[in-house]
């Protein structure tokens, strides 16, 4: 067999018997061991991988006026199940806004938001470590049955089973992992905490002269994890990265709007603005593989783990 081939060139489905990729596991798949199957179109083609995505949203909000202050509080949650198995996004948003008359001349308004966003397996694209589109549409063979790929992607002892094996005696992947191995074993996830908002004050000296001061802030902390399981085409690894970012804007303005007659008003202002921003990330990753399978920790690195960082 030409095990180096990881693509199809359109051979006719003529029913010729051949040994499929799952016909070499005597221990765990004795019912298929060395049993040929006809060369034919798969019963479960690439559409078997996909499912209907589901988006569940719910929210509650409360508004109240107390004296000269108007308050609004809202809490929302959004959960999205992706069209590819084992992919998910969840977002929770807490929001508070207000406006208040503090005196005859002084007013204040603002709003604050706190958002927690979690994602599971967000990076399944044309890459070496997440070859979903690559395996299904670029480098693959058209006779593959997706149900078989799903049912047999992992042996009971944890061994990776892929259609793209190196040889009859060597079941390790030559070029590509089983797509279901990627989805359930080579996983990634991230979680972000974000806080942003603004607060402002307006002071009226006269009917034509007033001052405005505002502060805008946006802060987030993002933690990401990426895993390559033992037995994958790529070297087993674990990478964890922490990102932090803060952005603040300050502005102050003095407005003057005199009336220069019955039908004519002049509008002008002077002001100052300042921006402060900070960004940094810290990353740690294993090297040379993982000592123990299914244990993702930097201390499980075969060689000394490495770290890097950046700050601006």
Question: Where are each of the predicted segments found?
Answer:
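Surface-exposed loop/interface segments of Gram-negative outer-membrane beta-barrel transport/assembly proteins
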Residues: 1-42, 52, 82-87, 93-194, ...
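Outer-membrane beta-barrel initiation region
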Residues: 48-53, 59-66, 154
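Phosphate-interacting basic helix/loop segments used at nucleotide- and nucleic-acid interfaces
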Residues: 58, 195-196
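Residue-level signature of outer-membrane beta-barrel architecture
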Residues: 64-66, 77, 96, 100, ...
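Alpha-helical support elements that line or immediately flank enzyme active sites
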Residues: 197-203, 217
């Amino acid at each position: 067999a030409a095990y180096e081939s990881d693509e199809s060139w359109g051979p006719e489905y003529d029913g010729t018997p051949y040994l499929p990729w799952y016909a070499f596991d005597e221990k765990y798949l004795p019912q298929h061991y060395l049993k040929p199957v006809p060369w034919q179109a798969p019963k479960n083609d690439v559409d078997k991988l996909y499912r209907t995505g589901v988006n569940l949203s719910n929210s509650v909000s409360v508004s109240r006026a107390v004296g000269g202050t108007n308050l609004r509080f809202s809490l929302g949650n959004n959960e999205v199940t992706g069209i590819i198995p084992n992919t998910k996004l969840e977002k929770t948003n807490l929001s508070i806004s207000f406006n208040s008359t503090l005196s005859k001349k002084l007013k204040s308004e603002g709003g604050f938001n706190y958002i927690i966003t979690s994602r599971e397996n967000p990076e399944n694209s044309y890459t070496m470590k997440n070859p979903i589109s690559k395996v299904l549409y670029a480098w693959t063979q058209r006779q593959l049955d997706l149900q078989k790929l799903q049912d047999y992607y992992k042996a009971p002892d944890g061994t990776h089973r892929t259609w793209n094996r190196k040889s009859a005696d060597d079941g390790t992947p030559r070029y590509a992992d089983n797509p279901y191995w990627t989805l359930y074993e080579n996983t990634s996830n991230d979680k972000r905490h974000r806080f942003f908002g603004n607060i402002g004050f307006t002071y009226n000296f006269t009917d034509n002269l007033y001052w405005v001061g505002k502060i805008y802030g946006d802060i987030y902390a993002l933690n990401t994890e990426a895993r390559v399981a033992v037995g994958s085409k790529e070297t087993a690894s674990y990478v964890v990265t922490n990102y932090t970012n803060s952005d603040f804007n300050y502005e102050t303005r003095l407005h003057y709007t005199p009336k220069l007659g019955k039908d004519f008003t002049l509008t002008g202002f002077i002001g100052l603005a300042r921006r402060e921003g900070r960004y940094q990330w810290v990353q740690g990753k294993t090297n040379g593989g993982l000592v123990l399978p299914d244990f993702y920790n930097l201390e499980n690195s075969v060689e000394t783990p490495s770290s890097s960082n950046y700050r601006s």
